[in-house]
Amino acid sequence: MNVLEIGAGGREHALAYKLNQSNLVKQVFAIPGNEAMTPIAEVHTEISESDHQAILDFAKRQNVDWVVIGPEQPLIDGLADILRANGFKVFGPNKQAAQIEGSKLFAKKIMEKYNIPTADYKEVERKKDALTYIENCELPVVVKKDGLAAGKGVIIADTIEAARSAIEIMYGDEEEGTVVFETFLEGEEFSLMTFVNGDLAVPFDCIAQDHKRAFDHDEGPNTGGMGAYCPVPHISDDVLKLTNETIAQPIAKAMLNEGYQFFGVLYIGAILTKNGPKVIEFNARFGDPEAQVLLSRMESDLMQHIIDLDEGKRTEFKWKNESIVGVMLASKGYPDAYEKGHKVSGFDLNENYFVSGLKKQGDTFVTSGGRVILAIGKGDNVQDAQRDAYEKVSQIQSDHLFYRHDIANKALQLK
């Protein structure tokens, strides 16, 4: 079959790589893709992921059987709806169901109504009310901007001054807009991907752990993710089972009950507190960089899993008996202002590297984004995989990238 993958980042590179491995897939197309994907997919960088009509025309022209949507923006903009209305099979939720990521308030209200464990929250609609609220709220407080923010719309404020600064960042020059304040939760964070079709929820039996902060020791601002690893040895199967029972199954049923038909992968960003797992966030797609490490470890056929889900079957995932560690290299300055156009070399176009922000300039690759390339390490355990990942990092040549040196350290300290 012909499969069209939407998106241009490292997550989409990993999806294209995994789909290309499937015996069920004859050809992978990528829109817009990136030039590092050319060994595994027919890449069409001339088409934008926001040009829904051009994507539809392409899918018709190429007799596409399935469309797999990677990033959140096309989902929230309704690309899946347009494709389905024209008879195409799509892995990814419709516009209404994608609100679970598109609006933090939407997600909080559903969790509140159906008693799904999450932090207590307070919504405000005006800047002056936000500034009033923080004068007496418990610190630290989590400040979240409603809507999409590429993983960077969350600030944890330890002081009133930091909370005021967060509000200024969230509102800018505006006086109105929805901001959600949450009680700060302490515990171990983890990411659980769950395949969902209506009230059928099939969670991965392998979780990943992301590293959101820009710098070592979890310092600096939040980013889209500076690395990840799987499995997570210090989070037990019992915790995964409990997360499935108290979060994954209930949220699938709740969404359907509210009239939202979710079909795709639901990312559950959770935290293991002393009172059990609680939801930090939901995403309507694979995490990035969690997808890169999870799909690298997945032994079974991703396309078969998608078809099984479409047919309402409780698909069974199979995993390689190894650990995977992914280390992200980013442009210096990220997640704030950064330069583009700097040469990067030393990497191969294979399963050891997934590209997020590079483009071809002649025969060389140059930086084109904040997060640039993820190096993948594999090993019999986390320690060996971590060593392998940093060996892969050391092969990359560039004076304009930085990376964290402590990805997966937590697993080694807590094992």
UniProtKB/Swiss-Prot annotation:
SUPFAM superfamilies found in the cross-reference section: Glutathione synthetase ATP-binding domain-like, PreATP-grasp domain, Rudiment single hybrid motif
Cofactor(s) required for function per UniProt: Mg(2+); Mn(2+)
Gene3D superfamilies, sorted: 3.40.50.20, ATP-grasp fold, A domain, ATP-grasp fold, B domain, Phosphoribosylglycinamide synthetase, C-terminal domain
InterPro entries, A to Z: ATP-grasp, ATP_grasp_subdomain_1, PreATP-grasp_dom_sf, PRibGlycinamid_synth_ATP-grasp, PRibGlycinamide_synth, PRibGlycinamide_synth_C-dom, PRibGlycinamide_synth_C_sf, PRibGlycinamide_synth_CS
Reaction catalysed by this enzyme: 5-phospho-beta-D-ribosylamine + glycine + ATP = N(1)-(5-phospho-beta-D-ribosyl)glycinamide + ADP + phosphate + H(+)
Binding site for Mg(2+): E281, N283
Pathway: Purine metabolism; IMP biosynthesis via de novo pathway; N(1)-(5-phospho-D-ribosyl)glycinamide from 5-phospho-alpha-D-ribose 1-diphosphate: step 2/2
GO-annotated molecular function: ATP binding; metal ion binding; phosphoribosylamine-glycine ligase activity
Residue ranges of domain ATP-grasp in the record: 108-311
Superkingdom assignment: Bacteria
EC class (word): ligase
Keywords assigned: ATP-binding, Ligase, Magnesium, Manganese, Metal-binding, Nucleotide-binding, Purine biosynthesis
Free-text remark on how the cofactor is bound: Binds 1 Mg(2+) or Mn(2+) ion per subunit.
One GO term (biological process): purine nucleobase biosynthetic process
Positions that bind ATP: 134-191
EC number: 6.3.4.13
Family (UniProt): Belongs to the GARS family.
PANTHER family: PHOSPHORIBOSYLAMINE--GLYCINE LIGASE (PTHR43472), PHOSPHORIBOSYLAMINE--GLYCINE LIGASE, CHLOROPLASTIC (PTHR43472:SF1)
HAMAP family (alphabetical): GARS (MF_00138)
Protein name, per record: Phosphoribosylamine--glycine ligase
Species of the source: Staphylococcus aureus (strain MW2)
Gene that this sequence comes from: purD
